[in-house]
Amino acid sequence: MPLSSQPSSSNLKRKQPTISSFFTKKPQLSQESISNDVLEKEERDEEREEVAKQEEGLRENGGTRSNNVDDDEDDVVAPASKRARTNGSHSQNTIETPKEKHVERPLPSDSIQKTELSKFASSPATEGETKERTKERERLHQKFVRRLGGPDCLIGIGRNTAPEAVPEEVGEGDEDDEPSPPPAAKGKATAKKGARKLTPMEKQVIDIKRKHMDTVLVVEVGYKFRFFGEDARTAAKELNIVCIPGKFRFDEHPSEAHLDRFASASIPVHRLHVHVKRLVSAGHKVGVVRQMETAALKAAGDNRNAPFGRKLTNLYTKGTYIDDMEGLEGSTASMSATGTSMATGYMLCITETNTKGWGNDEKVLVGIVAVQPATGDIVYDEFEDGFMRSEIETRLLHLAPCEVLIVGDLSKATEKLVQHLSGNKTNAFGDEIRVERAPKAKTAAAESHSHVSSFYAERMKKVNATNDVQASSLLQKVLNLSEQATICLSSMIKHMSEYGLEHVFQLTKYFQHFSSRSHMLLNANTLNSLEIYHNQTDHSTKGSLFWTLDRTQTRFGQRMLRKWVGRPLLNKLGLEERVDAVEELKNLERVALVEQMKCLLGRIKTDLEKSLIRVYYGKCTRPELLTLLQTLQMIAQEFAGVQSPADTGFSSPLISKAVASLPTILEDVVRFLDKINMHAAKNDDKYEFFRESEETDEITEHKLGIGAVEHDLEEHRSTAGEILGKRKVDYVTVAGIEYLIAVENKSPSIKKVPASWVKISGTKAVSRFHTPEVIRLLRQRDQHKEALAAGCDKAYATFLAEISASYQSFRDSVQSLATLDCLISLATIANQPGYVKPEYTNHTCIQVDQGRHPMVEQLLLDSYVPNDIDLDSDKTRALLVTGPNMGGKSSYVRQVALIAIMGQIGSYVPARSAKLGMLDAVFTRMGAFDNMLAGESTFMVELSETADILKQATPRSLVILDELGRGTSTHDGVAIAQAVLDYMIRSIRSLTLFITHYQHLSSMVHSFPDHELRNVHMRFTESGPTEEEITFLYEVREGVAHRSYGLNVARLANLPAPLIELAKQKSAELEQKIHRRRLAGLVRTVGDILADSAKADESLIERLISSAEQL
């Protein structure tokens, strides 16, 4: 077949280019990089000139080349040089050595070996060729192999065809697999197989990693996110994904010199936040590195040949991860049902300074600032703490932080406490705490004050300009924080700036002091002993007081109730206002209104508080924003007819004020919703998110540009049809590739396809092309699309900032709704049988008739035995509680404390009647455990905690002491217990419940003639031949239990029978011995009195009475 004729369709599929074409630049795998037809023509001309020069050079060297071509397959087209010779341009095929010396990279040895047998197949070497010609042959051969890739790659190369111009992100996905510079020439360190230079993308990753060595980096590479090096190993372990082996270190360590790439692991783009959440939950700090350029805009820019620009865009830890969409939806029912521990999400900053003393006399001044990024709440405090660090522990247990930032060095005692609470998953928080550290300069106080002042300077200007007195006072309060608190605040602002969340500190309205004396103090021991937030078995919420009272329907309501439980009120008026609101909500006359509110709360499926703060941060997604605004609109419209508190239908000021605040946001919400295209927002369509009238000029411009390009593409159909001899062609879309022109291979039109058309794909029947005009227009359209996406994101960010201006009014409405949720929850508890409204008094007393333990009652299948309590600061201030082991002593004293706490929360209490005074604190000393980290024994812990109670307790406190003195010998234990009890009653005068097995202490009642101390015991009945088998009655009665019946507990614990019998025998012997000794002492006392009755004083008589009672 003549070379000038049209090739067959089969020849179109497989054609062999010229050798010189392998030395020219390859077309890139993107639409933007495909050359136009003019450039292609120039390149072909250059190829012909180069071949001609080479042939002339060969003739001069005397070399000849065989004209025989190995062309076994008839569908392979002859090379360009042969076509040129046929046309009469040259008579011989000779190759000239080029004059310009090109610096070529040597090929890998394996590539040379693969093609050794097939090189120069069509021109066998001449015997007399010179060394220079041999070198030239080898150089050309290496060029040929490098460009072609191997002897079999000629198959499938067609005329003017190019691979589909896939988006550059796909290429970026394999950036680390790009061919790297091969090793040096043969014989030079070829043993280091795989050693190579770093790719541009790997250099980017290393540069970012060196700045964030403590961070697990997730790098966007095309359509995947990838982990490299040690981060890949971490991700594989935590996420259970595959880690491809390679280098783990980022410092080019010699031990990994034999490896040619980094270890890697990958995750899909759409699963990014799922895996990030799992990593931060495991305690890791995670950074997301994103591509900052798009394919279309990059191709049009000046850096088209450089790698994609990448930047660390997000940093996450457990406390700063606010992009969790799962936590925004759903009610509290599932959490309450499982009893799982609810993390508060606080990040706490702590610093301390030693003020005086050392050892047991040590005093430290501590400052804390805690922020909850998910809600915007901020807590601060400065306080002095003793060597037991009970104050720090109290705040840590109340706040339950998930992260702790330590500024400067802590003392050993504080360091041990923080490490103990954060270092294991079985602590009171139920999870590990992430601990970070920040340096503290000697001039930290001055620097921190300057930093905080400059941070709030802009806000101060705005406040002064608007003459907002309330905002000004709040801001002034923040600026006047104590020295230690200011250091913490400054450190937290810097720390949160790293995560882009520092704006949370601009919300000065939500700063709260921790140690406000408007709340009852519940320290760490009390929280644990009374199981306020977590049970002591598995540290879950099930079985805790919070679990008992939690009937909330929303997440933000649940968080508010948690604060109420941990901070019972001291203000009698505020307390009565809250309990009156609960009473009204359970009133049958308000059933319809209460059901309306319950129904409204039940329809709220999102965490409004978290969504609002995400809007404030500018991180809210479009569907989430639509849900937020629609939910706020639903809430406001539910009470749209309420103009004032008097219109609500409730008489309680607390309820009516909360309801009246809800419709005030309706106008702003509707104004924002009117700007949104609901359908597009629901589908997260950024291009149509705004209504047409609300679109910015930039968005409109690029939309018009896209429309113009698509119009030109439509017009181009006629032009393409004329070329193919048709009236008009139709575009087809295959595998996501648009605007393809399909031409049947057997039709006459295939012969009319210009060489400038790029073949994209095809089958046996059809070939599909892109014309140069289509390629140009698609490039324009992609640029417009990328610019449109950037414009839409910019307009959305501006819209979020506009909504943020109404943040405080929206937040206040959500807080009002949370208050209603909490009150309805307490009303639900109050509707349970056996609950009563407590009566409050300013006099310190606890008078409860038929009281019950609120948690045990719900967990027990059997009915709970109720008991009375009557403590009064002017009458009986203390009860000495005795009774057998497992007789219910601890449950009884816990019941008293829990009823007092519930009453001051504003809840109904489980009793027939209750009169409660305003207690300022509840202190407990229960259980026996040592503190190995501090080197303290069980008895040392007992006495240290008791000492703290004696220092902090007031006449308005309730103190519970359980078996004080059991950690040492009987004589010392009795002496200490007696001294402490006496001091509590006479000096401190607080309400006291004292549990003991020391029956000798019962004689103390004679020291208090006004009955400040009473003896009570837990009733039981004896049975069996030896009266060792007892039945617990769990009733509290006057008197003393003279035996503890420990052998009965041993029997219940299934100790071996012989062991119990031996213990019983020894117990009887010891009891008889003590009985005889007491009897002998009584006889001696009587003898002394009878011998000299005149000298018998009052103390001798008291000793006689005491000895008689002990018998």
From Swiss-Prot:
Q: Where in the cell is it found?
A: Nucleus
Keyword field contains Nucleotide-binding? yes
Annotated region described as Disordered, given as residue ranges: 1-141, 155-197
Give the start-end ranges of region Mispair-binding domain: 192-319
Indicate whether Nucleotide-binding appears among the record's keywords.
yes
Q: Where does ATP bind?
A: G883, P884, N885, M886, G887, G888, K889, S890
Compositional bias (Basic and acidic residues) at which positions? 50-59, 97-107, 128-141
**Compositional bias (Polar residues) at which positions?**
1-36, 86-96, 110-125
What ranges does the record list as Acidic residues composition bias? 166-179
Instruction: Give GO terms for biological process.
Output: mismatch repair; mitotic recombination
Q: Name one GO molecular function term.
A: ATP binding
Specify the domain of life of the species encoding this protein: Eukaryota
- Per the similarity annotation, which family is this? Belongs to the DNA mismatch repair MutS family. MSH3 subfamily.
Q: Which NCBIfam families match?
A: PRK05399.1
Q: Which PANTHER family match?
A: DNA MISMATCH REPAIR PROTEIN MSH3, DNA MISMATCH REPAIR PROTEIN MUTS FAMILY MEMBER
**Assembly:** Heterodimer consisting of msh2-msh3 (MutS beta). Forms a ternary complex with MutL alpha (mlh1-pms1).
| Protein known as | DNA mismatch repair protein msh3
Q: Which gene encodes it?
A: msh3
